[in-house]
Amino acid sequence: IKQNNIIKKEKKLLLVSFTILEDIVKNIVGNEYNVESITKPGMEVHGYQVTPSDLVRGSEAIIFIQNGFGFELWAEKFVTNLDVERITIANNLEPIFINEDIYKGKPNPHAWISPKRGILYVDILLEELSKLDPENKEKFKKNAQNFKNKIKKIDEDFSLFLNTLQKSKRYLVSCEGAFSYLTNDYDLKEAYLWPVNAESQITPKRMARVINLVKEKQIPAVFCESTVSSESQESVAKETGAFFGGNLYVDSLSKKNGPAESYLEMLEYNLGTIKNGFNASLKN
């Protein structure tokens, strides 16, 4: 039998810092590259410890893509050990700043939580990846447009839902203060038990503050995140009579067969969970 002597071209590696970014990049580049995330689904990203095998993958990659805004506390050290170019999304984004605790004045890194900012992530990555590979620019552009249309649909559906909510009820109460971009973009007010997960010790003072706010404003539902324990927030719900709406995905996509295996699924799941939390509480 005559052997097929076409040598399959090995795909180059684009290494990214976390799973949400991995999925966004894959949606733009399609099958042109291998795209891999250093942190795996369900992992806490802020305080991740780099492993020797991560450094090996880093040395094989043609680029390292990160969020920035201090999200990947380990990235500076990681990149210092490697001779690899870097794309940092935050260099092209307007930050919202954290306004309390030791993180006061530092940028909140979680911009991707808002569909409106997710569209900006796609635009920034499209531009940077087109510079990296001008030959595939048109293909990337087409992929990016398709992806943005899907995000836009999620954005529009959520806006329509919020229009049905009383202004006084538009509070998003979470464990981590990760939703500033979402609350900012959709005219919601934000409250949380701690500003960033790296600082996830709940103090009696913080707890009391959130409980008082939920009672005073009669906030219908409270939420937590998938990578931390929801125990404290469930106590808030019990104490106030608010509905515990469940866990939202913030720093990581879900593991296989979970509800948020892709960025679009994550947006749909989060916004659907928020919607259901408000709706269920209104029925009670």
For each of these PLM feature ranges, what is it?
Residues 1-284:
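Extracytoplasmic metal-acquisition and chelation regions
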